[in-house]
Amino acid sequence: MARIVDLLATGQTFSFEFFPPKDKEEEQLLGRTIADLQPLNPSFVSVTYRGGRISRERTTRVVVDLLKTTDLTPMPHLTCVAHPRFELGEIIGGFRAAGLENLLALGGDPLPEEESYKELAYASELVELGRRLGFDSIGVAAHPAGHPRSPDLKSDREHLAFKMKLADFAITQFFFKVEEYERLRDQMAALGITKPILAGIMPITSLVSVQRMAQLSGYAVPDDIVRRIEAGGDDRAEIRKRGIEVATELCRDLLDAGVPGLHFYTLNFSKATREIYANLGLVGSGD
């Protein structure tokens, strides 16, 4: 299986994020989405992780199934939340034993009190643990607007620089302006970090949903983007069309700016990503 760090060394990557299904209906949806997106030949795919025993089982099942039954390169997410250190070691060891080569190490979002146990405080500690247990291709998260729990942007950038010195690449939270990415990249370069920072892409198919997700990550959708989407009125098809246009333009701008990779947050649906691929003229796109 390919290592993402090696793929990035050879050129731009295009990748997709999925979340593990909670029931049979979601499982069938994910299966259809993977079947729809596999012909686009993504560089890799990632599978999210919430934290705790159930999430551990679900994420592991999906990534191992992808590894065994498809030609895709899967990367599990892993968070510090809800696991003592020895359990995190068991999970990482299980990933390696299954043949996985890539890991996305995250601090993790707060969980309900009964699941909130957290022995490792920072993603950087998880990166170090992953290294010791055999992972040579590890990514971390980056927030263009700053992590919601960071006291200020300066400390956020310093913490990100520390993480990226330990890791191999970063994937950003979603954003909507190429300037936001360029600012982050330049700030990291000023701190001596030139490792790849992949851009997270979230197509707007519902403004309310995206604004809610953005708020959870401490980000606000830019006003001009909001106005552009809202100009679609109550016409859902028009709103969706405008959202795809916004995402396509952002991807073009990022590619022109030399972004090392685009990582699409699919929400387990394929259509928006396939449309953006087609708009960009990327191979394998279409229905």
Task: Name the predicted role of every residue range.
Residues 1-16, 23, 28, 284-287:
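N-terminal amphipathic alpha-helix/helix-capping segment at the start of soluble metabolic enzymes
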Residues 1-5, 25-28, 53-65, 84-91, ...:
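Active-site-adjacent beta->alpha loops and helix N-cap segments on the catalytic face
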Residues 3, 118-144, 149, 191-244, ...:
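Active-site pocket-lining/capping segments in soluble small-molecule metabolic enzymes
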Residues 13-29, 74-86, 139-155, 230-245:
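Active-site mouth loops of central-metabolism enzymes
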Residues 17, 45, 95, 163-166, ...:
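Conserved, mostly hydrophobic/aromatic
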Residues 18-21, 48-52, 77-83, 108-110, ...:
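Active-site beta-loop-alpha junctions enriched in small/polar residues
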Residues 24-37, 59, 85-93, 151-162, ...:
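Short, acidic/polar
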Residues 33-48:
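Catalytic domains of carbohydrate-active enzymes, especially glycoside hydrolases
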